[in-house]
């Protein structure tokens, strides 16, 4: 028969907390229920200051707190009381022989290590906030959950008092508390280990990739389903990470879906790939349109939508600047799943929230740098995020392979086309006119098909436009598809064994061809 439902009365509690939130109410409640309280340092002082009976830990151990408080509870008379399995008669006999009393409750929270690091404190100050005794007590109590309940979060204090009044926690409840406690110390240890690793020279100075890395992921939301209705899904966030889309504030609309998040992330990154006012419209993680404008964000949105209005239906929109009332008015006429921006004009927000189904998000600007992680079977791939910071992303470093140098307007469009390529799944061809994509060929397994798709999408607008390819043309056919449609200038990385043939085809067509020397695959 299961004993999970049997309650173990709480007669003695050990309390040692840095965060004093709710401490006095907890101590008063425990005392009123007849629970003896043993405590340490400032925790004991806070409890005693309210006239609540408390036994200081040094009275228990017969050993003073020493080394500026580094040693308080690291003593056999404390840990024997935490680790004794009261189901074991030999353990009970050992306690009696030693004159040690067991604890049935441990309430501990830890020094604020992560907050200290984030504050910019010195190395020595951070080291002082690495808790030793606290995690030791938490882990001991969690290990011994058949006999001890452990609580590490002040939000759990009401549950403690409720359990005390009901005869104690059940074994099932202590197991749950132990699980939470081990999660707490694991998060703490990851934070300490990650910081400590960052303070020492890497084993391989030529790489930014550590031998070990850890992350703290907390479930932030359950999602309705995953990519498909038969798949379950959830959103996780790293509390210590730079605020991003996972921390976006939703101002309006129904809950976000898995696909909403993936498309919004792609759109958000695409919009911030450009310095001018930019709007990106994404569907299935690929652009329906991207555009920039020196005039207004509404103008950028109009141009982005015009790239592929059919595909933009039900898409996700991202802006790198405040959404204006004019843009919001246009967006409200189109079925849109999500719009995300750093800010909204009040009138724009009023307009958008009249639409029942659109999800309106405010998010912080994406952080530069960082790493991308991709799970694979049995492992994880890590790479530096593609931030358009390669040497070839600067047009000053481009090589003119053939044709006349581009005039300023043409060069501006070429740069925009090149930067927009990063947001398109490979193989990618982007055709641009007047700061807007007009034809996008994406996700094709050969480059000539990507060129054909981009030309088909662009139609008559392609004549006189410019184009970019995210990787080199392996054969002249892709470039010839573009020039036959009227593209006047092209930028691509170069590097193919057939570069001379490709350049010759460009010269024959009389167009301008630039080489970047950098590639922007996206898979």
From Swiss-Prot:
Residues of the MGS-like domain: 4-152
Pfam family for this entry, one: AICARFT_IMPCHas
EC number: 2.1.2.3, 3.5.4.10
Gene3D superfamilies referenced in this protein's UniProt entry, alphabetically: 3.40.140.20, Methylglyoxal synthase-like domain
Pathway the protein contributes to: Purine metabolism; IMP biosynthesis via de novo pathway; 5-formamido-1-(5-phospho-D-ribosyl)imidazole-4-carboxamide from 5-amino-1-(5-phospho-D-ribosyl)imidazole-4-carboxamide (10-formyl THF route): step 1/1; Purine metabolism; IMP biosynthesis via de novo pathway; IMP from 5-formamido-1-(5-phospho-D-ribosyl)imidazole-4-carboxamide: step 1/1
Protein's gene: purH
Domain characteristics, as noted in the entry: The IMP cyclohydrolase activity resides in the N-terminal region.
Keyword line: Hydrolase, Multifunctional enzyme, Purine biosynthesis, Transferase
SMART domains linked: AICARFT_IMPCHas, MGS
Family annotation (InterPro entries): AICAR_Tfase_dup_dom_sf, Cytidine_deaminase-like, MGS-like_dom, MGS-like_dom_sf, PurH-like
GO MF assignments: IMP cyclohydrolase activity; phosphoribosylaminoimidazolecarboxamide formyltransferase activity
Family under the similarity heading: Belongs to the PurH family.
GO cellular component, one term: cytosol
SUPFAM superfamilies, per database record: Cytidine deaminase-like (SSF53927), Methylglyoxal synthase-like (SSF52335)
Full protein name: Bifunctional purine biosynthesis protein PurH
Recorded catalytic activity of this chain's protein: (6R)-10-formyltetrahydrofolate + 5-amino-1-(5-phospho-beta-D-ribosyl)imidazole-4-carboxamide = 5-formamido-1-(5-phospho-D-ribosyl)imidazole-4-carboxamide + (6S)-5,6,7,8-tetrahydrofolate; IMP + H2O = 5-formamido-1-(5-phospho-D-ribosyl)imidazole-4-carboxamide
Source organism (scientific name): Mycobacterium marinum (strain ATCC BAA-535 / M)
A biological process term (GO) from this entry: 'de novo' IMP biosynthetic process
């Amino acid at each position: 028969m299961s004993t999970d439902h049997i309650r173990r009365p709480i007669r003695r509690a050990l309390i040692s907390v840095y965060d004093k939130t709710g401490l006095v109410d907890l101590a008063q409640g425990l005392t009123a229920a007849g629970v003896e309280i043993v405590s340490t340092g400032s925790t004991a002082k806070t409890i005693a200051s309210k006239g609540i009976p408390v036994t200081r830990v040094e009275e228990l151990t017969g050993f003073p707190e020493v080394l500026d408080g580094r040693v308080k509870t690291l003593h056999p008379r404390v840990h024997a009381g935490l680790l004794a399995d009261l189901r074991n008669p030999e353990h009970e006999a050992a306690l009696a022989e030693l004159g040690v009393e067991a604890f049935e409750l441990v309430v501990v929270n830890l020094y604020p290590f992560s907050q200290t690091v984030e504050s910019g404190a010195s190395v020595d100050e951070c080291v002082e906030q690495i808790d030793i005794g606290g995690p030791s007590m938490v882990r001991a109590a969690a290990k011994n959950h058949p006999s001890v309940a452990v609580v590490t979060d002040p939000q759990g204090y009401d549950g403690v008092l409720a359990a005390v009044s009901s005869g104690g926690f059940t074994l099932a409840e202590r197991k749950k508390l132990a699980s939470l406690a081990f999660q707490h110390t694991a998060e703490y240890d990851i934070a300490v280990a990650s910081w400590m690793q960052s303070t020492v020279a890497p084993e391989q100075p030529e790489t930014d990739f550590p031998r070990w890395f850890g992350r703290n992921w907390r479930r932030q939301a359950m999602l309705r389903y995953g990519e498909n209705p038969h798949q379950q899904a959830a959103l996780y966030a790293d509390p210590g990470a730079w605020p991003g889309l996972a921390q976006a504030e939703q101002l309006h609309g129904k809950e976000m879906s898995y696909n909403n998040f993936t498309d919004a992330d792609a759109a958000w990154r695409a919009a911030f790939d450009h310095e001018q006012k930019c709007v990106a419209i994404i569907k299935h993680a690929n652009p329906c349109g991207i555009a920039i404008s020196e005039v207004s964000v509404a103008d950028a949105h109009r141009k982005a939508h015009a790239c592929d209005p059919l595909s933009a239906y039900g898409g996700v929109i991202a802006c790198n600047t405040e959404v204006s009332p004019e843009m919001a008015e246009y967006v409200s006429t189109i079925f849109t799943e999500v719009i995300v921006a750093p800010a909204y004009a009040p009138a724009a927000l009023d307009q958008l929230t009249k639409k029942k189904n659109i999800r309106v998000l405010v998010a912080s600007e994406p952080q530069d740098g960082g790493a991308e992680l991709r799970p694979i079977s049995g492992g994880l791939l890590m790479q530096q995020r593609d931030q358009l910071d390669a040497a070839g992303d600067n047009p000053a470093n481009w090589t003119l392979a053939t044709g006349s140098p581009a005039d300023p307007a043409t060069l501006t469009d070429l740069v925009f086309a090149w930067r927009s390529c990063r947001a398109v799944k490979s193989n990618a061809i982007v055709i641009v006119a007047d700061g807007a994509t007009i034809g996008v060929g994406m996700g094709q397994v050969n480059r000539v098909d990507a060129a054909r798709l981009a030309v088909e999408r662009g139609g008559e607008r392609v004549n006189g436009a410019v184009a970019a390819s995210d990787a080199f043309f392996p054969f002249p056919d892709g470039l010839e598809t573009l020039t036959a449609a009227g593209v006047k200038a092209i930028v691509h990385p170069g590097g193919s064994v057939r570069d001379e043939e490709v350049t010759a085809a460009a010269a024959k067509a009389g167009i301008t061809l630039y080489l970047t020397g950098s590639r922007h695959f996206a898979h």
